[in-house]
Amino acid sequence: MKLLTTGLLASAALVAAQEQQVLRADEVFGKAPLPDASIFDETIKQFQSSIEDGISHFWSEMKTNFKDYLPMISLPKKHNRRPDSEWDHVVRGADVESVWVQGADGEKRREIDGKLKNYDLRVKSVDPSQLGIDPGVKQYSGYLDDNDADKHLFYWFFESRNDPKNDPVVLWLNGGPGCSSLTGLFLELGPATIDKNLKVVHNPYSWNSNASVIFLDQPVNVGFSYSGSSVSDTVAAGKDVYALLTLFFKQFPEYATQDFHISGESYAGHYIPVFAAEILSHKNTNINLKSALIGNGLTDPLTQYPHYRPMACGDGGYPAVLDQGTCRSMDNSLERCLSLIETCYSSESAWVCVPAAMYCNSAILAPYQQTGMNPYDVRSKCEDMGSLCYPQLNAITEWLNQKSVMKALGVEVESYESCNSGINRDFLFHGDWMKPFHRLVPSVLEKIPVLIYAGDADFICNWLGNQAWTEALEWPGHKKFTEAKLQDLKIVDNKNKGKKIGQVKSSGNFTFMRIFGAGHMVPLNQPEASLEFFNRWLRGEWH
């Protein structure tokens, strides 16, 4: 769904602990027992001798104040795996990997590239009448299994409402990291939402209006996914996504011939460059990747972090949330923040990337969160921090936890939660947050178009920062893209033709959009506008 603020809380907590030396870690991270970190003492001691004073001091404070939380891992979910006989289809990765064909040069090669032998895909045909979601629309759910690593990723597929034999296929990924893509399904762009009475409500602006959509709960231990192990960085998750798509299209070759697009929001700004690059790295594949879409993403922190102060202090098109004194304090902290991020970019080591995330989030992002305003929409207060400021999530979570729903989908875990804060901490404490995944975008742009869109009322991944990193990105089309002017984006597809919904600039394979009146989740706040640009993008406009 969104960039979780758990990282901000952890960062702010560390700063408070440095000042007061009284803050208890269990009050910040919860009371679940975790392994003792004494094994890290010697490692940290040795490392401190080779790093700069600021970073060394940070790790000393971490070891003192959060000793029990350094070896952070997300806890496994209770689950009960169903036998293969209860599934409608089971696709063996080993079978796919064993198929060889003769190429045009007469040489034998594998039909499909990639390390697939450890993966299986289990498929259940979902009866729409049981759930009341899009009756008449074909649906599948199931799990991608990495049997060696004991990882099981849940997915839910909805065929296009329009022309499934010809319409493209889209993968949707929520962010967090650690938020279920089913939040995107029911809160934003899927075929239905859930009201406060737990009734299914049809969504006329669903993205499966003209495309088939796969919603994937990843990484493991998110949503209905589960594992006895954990994934704590973006790159590891990329291999799983490639395997899922490969086996899905192998089972359903009728979709493999159609255009495929990968999309997502928030921390998917990390995921999508990696996942797209992984897919494009394979020469022989059944994934017909045509474009990538990132909404309100975190992709290039070094370029994006300077734009938090302007967005919070009245320079982003909305009234200031913070007072002038707090804004000056953020300005004063920025130089050190950027220096830490630059060091992270140079080494990409957790030892330096974690301090960058902790310091920058506490100094640059946390002041906004402490106001009680919604970090995902500067126009409103946070109604319920427990539901990430969106109380609608409570009904969605309750509906998905019904035994009848779980049975209809073939779910193997005991419960569902919209976001797993443990996953968020895993990624944060492994240094993933600040890594420069934007460096993969130029190679992606060489092969496919990329759309960066941003609701202009979001703070946490705001439009100022997203426009800035797209214009700063070094790639062959940089000069022309930077010189391109923002043009009005208007509706052309329905009765509201001519209505202004945002601004767009495009050159070559790169496009940036600012969507008016939308927060972090554009399809939630502006469903008509989101379906408008989505359909036009899939048709090839702007690229």
From Swiss-Prot:
Q: What residues sit in the active site?
A: S266, D458, H520
Report the domain of life of the source organism. Eukaryota
Cysteine disulfide partners in this protein: C179-C419, C313-C327, C337-C360, C344-C353, C382-C389
GO biological process terms held by the UniProt record: proteolysis
Q: Where is the signal peptide?
A: 1-17
Task: Give the EC number(s) listed in the UniProt record.
Answer: 3.4.16.5
Q: Does the keyword Protease apply?
A: yes
Q: Which Pfam families match?
A: Peptidase_S10 (PF00450)
One term of GO molecular function: serine-type carboxypeptidase activity
Provide one Gene Ontology cellular component.
Answer: fungal-type vacuole
Described purpose of this protein according to its UniProt entry: Vacuolar carboxypeptidase involved in degradation of small peptides. Digests preferentially peptides containing an aliphatic or hydrophobic residue in P1' position, as well as methionine, leucine or phenylalanine in P1 position of ester substrate.
Which protein are we looking at? Carboxypeptidase Y homolog A
Q: Which organism is it from?
A: Arthroderma gypseum (strain ATCC MYA-4604 / CBS 118893) (Microsporum gypseum)
